[in-house]
Amino acid sequence: MLSTILNAFQVADIRKKLAFTAGMLLIYRLGSHIPVPGVNLTAVNAIQKSFGGSNILGLLNLFSGGSLSRLALFALGIMPYITSSIILQLLQVAVPSLEKLSKEGEVGQARITQYTRYLTVGLAFAQSIGYVFLFHTLQAKAGESVVTHFDAPHIFLIVICLTTGCVMLMWIGELITQRGIGNGISLLIFASIVSRLPAGIQAWWTTPNQVFKVMMPFLVLAIVAGIVFVQEGQRRIPVQYAKRVIGRRMTEGGQTYLPLRVNMAGVIPVIFAASIMAFPPTVGQLVKTHWGQQVSDFFSPNGWHYVVGESIFIVIFTYFYTAVTFNPVDQADNLKKYGGFIPGVRPGRPTAEFLDRILARLTFPGALFLAAVAALPTILIARTHQNIQLGGTSILIVIGVALETMKQLEAQLMMRSYEGFLK
């Protein structure tokens, strides 16, 4: 890993991509400390503890990189965009016109991306209104109003600023994906979680529970090792290519393999599941009624309802995103088109069924592992009554995004080495 990073800095083009990515992430972190206009900073500082625990506000604050607790420009984080992406991907299965659009190549994907952006703006606007009223209800803890003037013009100004911040984050994420290294949206969440690491380490170090203090580092190391093992694990399907006559020349047949990863979906299912499970308690916090409080308590991040629900969604999204990433029918058609076949399996439909069966067997343990890693640290923190935000979901996202970014960096280096060879 270290050699890959050192080699990357020796290539001018990759060096520019890394610098661009770092610059965009720096802008994100700066925006996370810029308060929106019309906010009483003294009152905001007085309610910081409400966002420091392992409740739903602490979880939302974690994914916003601490911006929510400061009611900063990027307080919404990137969650509205992720929610919009989930909705559009699910609609592609249910709505025939969207399904047809998704199969029209780059033009269709560009249209779907545009719809995702529009939906993001709508969700961000609605969520901004909810957050303004949420902070207004927290004034009892602050002793004074968080919003300096709670009237329509000032509320509208704050809502517009928060919505603009979310749209700006969406734009930064897309820019990183296009001109930088790695997936921009994943890297923004990665930066948010990493920025909260010092607070998590301090909470662990100052805990009076000595058993928890000793166990936590070993648990984290075991989780990291397990994530790397599963993320890098793959089954290699042997592929044989027959001899082919091209013009007057006969090409030699060869043997290679088709790598099927244990966790082909990567860290996306975990991000999607966390986004879905954050929705009910967020609504419960915004609706200041007895029913709303019950919903918020029922889906508390440390409750077993939340853990079970998140685990189920992780398994579902792992299968769903694996199906989006790898299509056995298309893979079988490509093998048949170029004269390839799997020994002992007939080309065409039998090959597709074989790949689908193997992929299902690989995906199931991978999905269960992701769900277990997300749940176990959360259960441990809840049972030991520790006030630490960094649970299994956070560790999964950080390690998963780091591994995927390193793979993209290695792919960029390999591509540049081939270009140098051809020159």
Per-region residue spans from a language model:
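N-terminal cationic and glycine-rich segments that engage phosphates or anionic surfaces
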Residues: 1-102, 107-423
